[in-house]
Amino acid sequence: MKRRNRAQRLLRLTAVYLLLLPFLLLGWLYSRLPDRVYLEPGQTLLLPRFGWVEPMGLHGSQNAASTQVVGSYQTTLSLGGWLPIKNIRTVVTERAQVTVCGTPFGVKMFSEGALIVGFSDIDSPGGSTVNPAKAAGLRLGDRVIRIGQVRTENNDAVKEALEAARGSAAEVIYVRSGEQRSTTLTPVWDVAAAQWRAGMWVRDSSAGVGTLTFVDPEKGVFAGLGHPISDGDTGESIALRSGEIVPCEITGCSMGTVGSPGELKGKFLSAHAIGSIRINGENGVYGTTRTGFSGQTMPVAFAQEVETGDAQILATVSGETPRTYHVRIEKISDADPRRNMVIRVVDKALLSRTGGIVQGMSGSPILQNGRLVGAVTHVLVNDPTRGYGIFAQTMLEQAEQVATAEK
């Protein structure tokens, strides 16, 4: 009797799982499908990474899976042409052509507010050790934008604000995780330094080296890195107040090994800016330029056109001139906008020089089938021969936002 009841429960449970399985699979597929696709006029919508998925049609005056008319349309993706899965936006547009670079550039950036990068206790006149910043609830990575009536746009402004408070409680406006907050801080007289202090170290600027992905000379915009510029101590993305890019050359490289990412080393060649940074975003740095950059004019691939298999990257590991190296695109995903591809370096020359992907190569263009398909963004710490990439289409969208804002 007990065995029969156990068998019946198992059968019922199995039946429930079998009933739920199709819905779970459809939910998984829904989350993996893109929200938007781009097509050239007359191009048929194909999603080769989703073999059984096809469009049911474009709603509007145009029919089915292609159109000759530039515009935006709603498309219903279906399983096998009959089971609707997801409504997406199909944008029909002329294919963009950009100048593909792969050249190094220097970055000089000033943050919006003073970023807290450390704390140090203070010996007060009473002999006790205190830390006003910690007592006020401030944390590593918080961005202080005002103390009292003083806007803290740089380190000197923080010092000025503490001097103005002169030991009185002052309201502190700061940003944490994108949310503006407030607290009260009371500066303490530092006997050793003979000045008013808060017990926090702040930084208002950053500098580094990256790789330029592409330039659109007609629109006067550039794109690089493929990820945000972050503070080296806190890992927080730097909120941009102003920034510029300058000429740079690569002077050396430390090889990447398992557990220890390598790094390109460079130096700025001039203080003269060759571009102004407008966005420091999760998909890279973008800005305006009227400087002529050398490179090859290439079409930008739409995300659905990127394939697993052989590809190339343009990278500069010495001097100022990029070289082409062979890689393999192992995996493609539409789910994470920051990690669309997993790539593996297979070029022996690059492996012997750098060990694979190293810091400073972020932004190196990824080429496939005569098109710009993406940019290198990160190295896998436990395997320096592999790394992540972002779709070029995503970077192009961001660059076009800069161009539109400058009009």
Give the residues covered by each predicted segment:
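Interdomain regulatory linker/hinge segments that flank or connect interaction modules
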Residues: 2-3, 57-100, 278-325
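Hydrophobic membrane-insertion alpha-helices, especially the h-region
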Residues: 9-28
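PDZ domains, with a preference for the canonical peptide-binding region formed by the helix
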Residues: 66-68, 146-179, 383-385, 390-393
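PDZ-domain C-terminal substructure recognizer with occasional recognition of PDZ-binding tails
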Residues: 77-79, 86-88, 92-94, 159-199
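PDZ/PDZ-like groove recognition
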Residues: 110-135, 139
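A short glycine-leucine-enriched loop at secondary-structure breakpoints
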Residues: 129-143, 166, 356-360
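Conserved PDZ fold ligand-binding element
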Residues: 133-156, 366-369, 373-378
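Serine endopeptidase catalytic core focused on the charge-relay Asp
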Residues: 186-359, 368-369, 377, 383-398
